[in-house]
């Protein structure tokens, strides 16, 4: 069936901000869908609230709306753009839920919009746990025994039938939010209450336990003529009980017999037919009892998913692109598989002759209070994928791609001769955490047999054999040393994935010595192509991975090449914003006639799409792996300043190995990062920093702190995302920090800065060229005060309260800094501004980062200036004048960026903001005034607007004066006020009628009781010092559990209260309309 001619305009809904369970894989699928549909001549309208995505670039769709993904807002867009169809399968759970809301509220019917890709009934049947179970029974497939409950009483009745342990899965939530595994009645009641509250339809599935069963996924694509193909089978190394997003997964499945594989293949196709997914990709999950072979269907997603991004990258088959074309009427046999140059139709099932391993990346170090055990609720923030000719090779490559500091299956640090530590080891094997893989390796070091490890972990013995093999090879290396290794043995070690760095660790040498030995013995990797057909057809697409075999398929050209190093796995502090910059660099330099080479190992991203750059190397970002690629490709320049801290850490070593690093020199990067050298530069330029110093011992830290004065911001040097950063208010606090939080030494000193209380923080992004010309990209004023990590603070462009004179002063300082550091490309600078009593401002320089920052995409969207593209051209030698961009663009509207946090997913974590970054994503709102833009950003971030009721106020002494106008504004809007004793006295004194309530420590009834009883609608709570923060923890946590809006800074509270009247009001603007205003 050729494409439909009755559709002209198609609306695509994106996935919104990056959250746990929904990361940049939907930017990848959405961007593919936009490109595919526009190439077919359709007009595409896109809505997505996340400015850090490639899909929201103005040239990705005909009309791009960075607006809240709520049915009311989307209705305004539908009324304005009049689409013929809505494609809801590219934006994850967010888009599906929004599409169902639009259908349920009659919006689609009212405007005559057709759902394509997945029908309303199909979405409902797949997402509604009870309907799905009944549907499976009708086609003779089993689900785990389970029933749906809409109340705690009903849940307890079902639990009595299925027994403990019990699995709880809320309906219509993302990444298993609100779910879990329970072993006793108390846990059961807790999780049921939470699940019912977090499910948008207030229902949960109470399910029998299939813990320890094997888990498999099938990625299926089906067209309107009922042609079905299996793109990929995926096996979870971790058994059932760990969310598939948190499991180590392997493709293709390794431990299925052919008969079992055919059985799952037939079952997954039957599931798609029954649910009614008639065009597009779906993912079906199965559990298999290893003892009896019983197969159950766990669930299916009637959309592209995290697994389909993985399957696409693993096979080279672009699922989202194909799914988009199937949704407009094509059939699989009419479409070509582009990776083979169109030699095969898309109806050929991909076949692969290598093994792919995905390992998730966690961020528990950011949330020490979180429960780090892995369950059915997803907790990972990113993932890494690696390819090899054997499972062992791809596993070890993935481990070093994770960037957790491990270069192989390193020991966990347990003393394996101690009885106590062996108890810990057994517990870690039984109750999985983020590091379980390393404990498995430790178990073999401790002499456990495969059967022992299986009995504790239920990881299939086939995988355990492979890990045992790696550990045995390590043992032989330790005994024999580097001197005894010949070419054959070294090649064998490389074939099972050993890195040079790991071999060096085991033989007590260094990486340089191992590399030199490899050179002498001529042991070098070759590069193989990913072609989706196991080499059956020749492919012109250069999508490559390394392995140690005979024939190399890299076939490099002799064109001028630029290599871009990506950011590796997503994590807190280094996310999609950096991938956005890498993609822009590839696109711009490709337009300029360079051959672009991307190196990255994150399967979720647009940068690892095989048609983003000319050549893609899917490899870990380590010195060894990058140098090998450089040797094959000989680029004229390598860009390290776009992938965050990951490639920056390699800059000096690359330069030392003769690699041409372009842009700002590694020497300048080091000057900006080295505190003492940078301090001298700041003094030479006559700029002002907060009083600060560097301590190399714990004693020195305490002495220097007395000179600077408290409060202090303390942190280790060289960190991204404020890792291990803290504000300390006194000597006892500092002593604890240098004792517990960091190991202070000559090589890793600790940095002390005077903390500027109540200062306004400002971010400035600029581009500089080789002639020292500087383009100001944007000046952003933070809404939260200094002391909240810049990545966690909301910010406004242009600034909403800074005077023009102060803004000009900032511009002058930034230009001088960029010139002094010889920046070529992007630079981000952070300032803090303190107001004097006479109204004048003092500007303090906080830090300079001569690299792409996480605000680049936001600034580009707000101003219409593609900063990353312009800066990439500056790095290859073009000046700003040659690119005709010399003037800063300051919009007449306001754009506000709001950070999105994972607190709901992580039980036990304090949602207070501080100097350590904890947000996973961001949204953007635009308005004609700051308050209107802030309101739109809050809507996009799903932050509830408090309706008049009782507001609870409890603030530290320095904030009492500043909270008064905020409280008066609340009273004016009809709110009542409840406060703790000190705040109550101050408000009473100033004529505010309010009630007093106990702090938690003062006895009951206290404020937490009021929150639990639903008597509080809004909370303003500021604290300082560890003790006060700990005392008020339960207030913030209960507020989060009961979905009560809260502010932990005065500036945040003021912005929120002033924006309430703008909630849900105002027209919607496309980026194209906004950018047109800027060009007038």
Curated annotation (Swiss-Prot):
Residues 943-1080 are annotated as: Allosteric domain. Residues 404-554 are annotated as: Oligomerization domain. Residues 1-403 are annotated as: Carboxyphosphate synthetic domain. Mg(2+) 3 binds at residues 830, 847. Binds 4 Mg(2+) or Mn(2+) ions per subunit. Pathway: Amino-acid biosynthesis; L-arginine biosynthesis; carbamoyl phosphate from bicarbonate: step 1/1; Pyrimidine metabolism; UMP biosynthesis via de novo pathway; (S)-dihydroorotate from bicarbonate: step 1/3. It comes from the Bacteria. InterPro entries: ATP-grasp, CarbamoylP_synth_lsu, CarbamoylP_synth_lsu_oligo, CarbamoylP_synth_lsu_oligo_sf, CbamoylP_synth_lsu-like_ATP-bd, CbamoylP_synth_lsu_CPSase_dom, MGS-like_dom, MGS-like_dom_sf. It catalyses: hydrogencarbonate + L-glutamine + 2 ATP + H2O = carbamoyl phosphate + L-glutamate + 2 ADP + phosphate + 2 H(+). Coiled coil: none annotated. Residues 555-942 are annotated as: Carbamoyl phosphate synthetic domain. Mn(2+) 1 binds at residues 285, 299. GO terms for biological process: 'de novo' UMP biosynthetic process; glutamine metabolic process; L-arginine biosynthetic process. One of its GO terms (molecular function) is ATP binding. Mg(2+) 4 binds at residues 847, 849. Composed of two chains; the small (or glutamine) chain promotes the hydrolysis of glutamine to ammonia, which is used by the large (or ammonia) chain to synthesize carbamoyl phosphate. Tetramer of heterodimers (alpha,beta)4. Belongs to the CarB family. Large subunit of the glutamine-dependent carbamoyl phosphate synthetase (CPSase). CPSase catalyzes the formation of carbamoyl phosphate from the ammonia moiety of glutamine, carbonate, and phosphate donated by ATP, constituting the first step of 2 biosynthetic pathways, one leading to arginine and/or urea and the other to pyrimidine nucleotides. This is Carbamoyl phosphate synthase large chain. It comes from Xylella fastidiosa (strain 9a5c). The lineage of its organism: Bacteria, Pseudomonadati, Pseudomonadota, Gammaproteobacteria, Lysobacterales. The gene is carB.
């Amino acid at each position: 069936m050729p494409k439909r001619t009755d559709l002209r305009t198609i609306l695509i809904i994106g996935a919104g901000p990056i959250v746990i369970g929904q990361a940049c894989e939907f930017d990848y699928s959405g961007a593919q869908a936009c490109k595919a549909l526009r190439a077919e001549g359709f007009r595409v309208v896109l809505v997505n609230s996340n400015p850090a995505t490639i899909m929201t670039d103005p040239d990705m769709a005909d009309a791009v709306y960075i607006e809240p993904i709520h049915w009311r807002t989307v209705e305004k867009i539908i009324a304005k753009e009049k689409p013929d169809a809505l494609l809801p399968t590219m934006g994850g759970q967010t888009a599906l839920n929004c599409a169902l809301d639009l259908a349920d509220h009659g919006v689609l019917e009212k405007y005559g919009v057709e759902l394509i890709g997945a029908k309303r009934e199909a979405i409902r049947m797949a997402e509604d746990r009870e309907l799905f179970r009944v549907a499976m029974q009708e086609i003779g497939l089993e689900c785990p025994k389970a029933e749906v409950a809409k109340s705690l009483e009903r849940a307890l009745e079902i639990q009595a039938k299925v027994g403990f342990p019990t699995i709880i899965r809320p309906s219509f939530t993302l990444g298993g939010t609100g779910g879990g595994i329970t072993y006793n009645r108390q846990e059961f009641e807790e999780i049921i209450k939470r699940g019912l509250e977090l499910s948008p339809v207030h229902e949960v599935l109470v399910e029998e336990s299939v813990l320890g069963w094997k888990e498999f996924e099938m990625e299926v694509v089906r067209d309107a003529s009922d042609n079905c193909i299996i793109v990929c089978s995926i096996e979870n190394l971790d058994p059932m009980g760990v969310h598939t997003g948190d499991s180590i997964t392997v493709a293709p499945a390794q431990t299925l017999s052919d008969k079992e594989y055919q059985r799952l293949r037939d079952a997954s196709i039957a599931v798609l037919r029954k649910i009614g997914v008639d065009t597009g990709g779906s993912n079906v999950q199965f559990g298999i009892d290893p003892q009896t072979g019983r197969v159950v269907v766990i669930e299916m997603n009637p959309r592209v998913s995290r697994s389909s991004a993985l399957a696409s990258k693993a096979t080279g088959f672009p699922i989202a692109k194909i799914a988009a074309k199937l949704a407009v009427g094509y059939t699989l046999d009419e479409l070509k598989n582009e990776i083979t140059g169109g030699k095969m139709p898309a109806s050929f099932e991909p076949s692969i002759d290598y093994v792919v391993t995905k390992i998730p990346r966690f961020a528990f170090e950011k949330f020490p209070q979180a429960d780090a055990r892995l369950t059915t609720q997803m907790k990972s923030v990113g993932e890494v994928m690696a390819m090899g000719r054997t499972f062992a090779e791809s596993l070890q490559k993935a481990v070093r791609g994770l960037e957790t500091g491990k270069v192989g299956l390193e020991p966990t640090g347990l003393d394996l001769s101690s009885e106590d530590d062996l108890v810990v080891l057994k517990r870690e094997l039984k109750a999985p955490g983020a590091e379980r893989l390393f404990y498995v390796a430790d178990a073999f070091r401790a002499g456990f047999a495969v059967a022992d490890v299986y009995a504790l972990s239920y990881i299939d013995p086939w995988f355990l054999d492979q890990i045992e093999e790696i550990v045995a090879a390590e043992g032989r290396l330790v005994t024999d040393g580097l001197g005894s290794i010949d070419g054959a043995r070294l090649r064998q070690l490389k074939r099972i994935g050993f890195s040079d760095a790991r071999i060096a660790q085991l033989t007590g040498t260094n990486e340089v010595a191992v590399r030199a030995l490899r050179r002498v013995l001529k042991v070098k990797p070759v590069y193989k192509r990913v072609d989706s057909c196991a080499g059956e057809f020749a492919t012109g697409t250069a999508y490559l991975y390394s392995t140690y075999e005979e024939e190399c398929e890299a076939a490099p050209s002799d064109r001028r090449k630029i290599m871009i190093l990506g950011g590796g796995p997503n994590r807190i502090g280094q996310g999609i914003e950096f991938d956005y910059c890498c993609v822009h660099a590839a696109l711009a330099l490709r337009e300029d006639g360079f051959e672009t080479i991307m190196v990255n190992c994150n399967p979720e991203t647009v940068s690892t799409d095989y048609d983003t750059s000319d050549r893609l190397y899917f490899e870990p970002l380590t010195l060894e792996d990058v140098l090998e690629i450089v040797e094959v490709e000989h680029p004229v320049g390598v860009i390290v300043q776009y992938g965050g801290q990951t490639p920056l850490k390699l800059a000096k070593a690359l330069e030392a190995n003769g690699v041409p690093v372009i842009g700002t020199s590694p020497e300048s990067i080091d000057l900006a990062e080295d505190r003492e050298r940078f301090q001298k530069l700041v003094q030479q330029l006559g700029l002002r920093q907060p009083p600060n110093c560097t301590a190399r011992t714990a004693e020195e830290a305490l002495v220097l702190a007395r000179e600077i004065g408290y409060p202090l911001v303390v942190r280790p040097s060289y960190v991204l995302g404020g890792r291990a950063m803290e504000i300390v208010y006194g000597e006892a606090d500092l002593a604890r920090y240098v004792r517990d939080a960091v190991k202070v030494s000559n090589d890793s000193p600790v940095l002390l800065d005077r903390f500027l209380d109540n200062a306004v923080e400002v971010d400035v992004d600029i581009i500089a060229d080789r002639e020292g010309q500087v383009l100001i990209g944007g000046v952003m004023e933070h809404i939260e005060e200094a002391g909240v990590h810049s990545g966690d603070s909301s910010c406004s462009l242009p600034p909403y309260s800074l005077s023009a004179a102060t803004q000009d002063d900032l511009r002058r300082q930034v230009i001088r800094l960029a010139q002094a550091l010889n920046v070529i490309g992007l630079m981000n600078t952070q300032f803090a501004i303190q107001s004097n009593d006479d109204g004048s401002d003092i500007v303090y320089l906080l830090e300079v980062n001569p690299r792409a920052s996480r605000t680049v995409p936001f600034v580009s969207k707000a101003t219409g200036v593609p900063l990353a593209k312009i800066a990439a051209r500056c790095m290859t030698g073009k000046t700003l004048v040659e690119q005709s961009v010399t003037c800063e663009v300051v919009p007449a509207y306001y754009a506000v960026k709001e950070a999105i946090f994972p607190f709901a997913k992580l039980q036990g974590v304090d949602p207070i903001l501080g100097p350590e970054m904890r947000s996973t994503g961001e949204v953007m709102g635009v308005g004609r005034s700051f308050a209107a833009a802030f309101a739109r950003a809050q809507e996009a971030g799903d932050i509830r607007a408090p309706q008049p009721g009782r507001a609870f106020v409890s603030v530290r002494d320095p904030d009492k004066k500043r909270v008064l106008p905020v409280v008066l504004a609340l009273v004016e809007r009809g709110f009542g006020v409840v406060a703790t004793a000190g705040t109550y006295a101050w408000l009473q004194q100033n004529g505010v009628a309010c009630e007093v309530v106990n702090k938690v420590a003062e006895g009951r009834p206290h404020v937490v009781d009021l929150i639990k009883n639903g008597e509080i609608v809004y909370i303003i709570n500021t604290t300082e010092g560890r003790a006060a923060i700990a005392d008020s923890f339960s207030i913030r946590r209960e507020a989060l559990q009961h979905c009560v809006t809260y502010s932990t800074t005065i500036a945040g509270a003021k912005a929120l209260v002033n924006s309430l009247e703008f909630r849900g009001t105002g027209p919607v603007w496309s980026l194209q309309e906004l950018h047109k205003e800027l060009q007038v």
